[in-house]
Amino acid sequence: FDEAPAMKAQEITDATIALLRSGEYRYGRINFANGDMVGHTGNLDAAISAMETVDHCVQQLIDVIQELDGVLIYTSDHGNADQMFTESETGERIPMTSHTLAPVPFVIHDPQNNEMYDLVPPDDAGLSHIASTTMNLLGYEAPHDYNQSLLRFN
């Protein structure tokens, strides 16, 4: 993966944009695996290139979401490329190729929000709250056995 850190990110983005513009779908979920897969190689330059590619692709999606008055949620299930090295007891730099336990971002890009809701994460907020949050943004109530949404509607 470090030999082609862009992977298929642009192709995924192009296909997603085409589907979004088709008007056939209300919801889509995609995975840019670049940071994860390239992070496992321990190649810092490749990881930087991978994440620059993802940044570029996410910006394209944001632009289309704004054009279509949509909502974009950006998150991850774990870190990897965020910590590429650790140090030995002697100070030697050692590649770190495993997942990290670092907190991951959770961003809702909603240019049309109009103060319809507030972000009110519970103290134990985590990945298990994203399904109900997504359902709420789509206009549905989450099942009672789901963890609570991260949103409170006004």
Predicted regions and their residues:
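Feature captures the catalytic ectodomains and active-site-proximal regions of enzymes
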Residues: 1-154
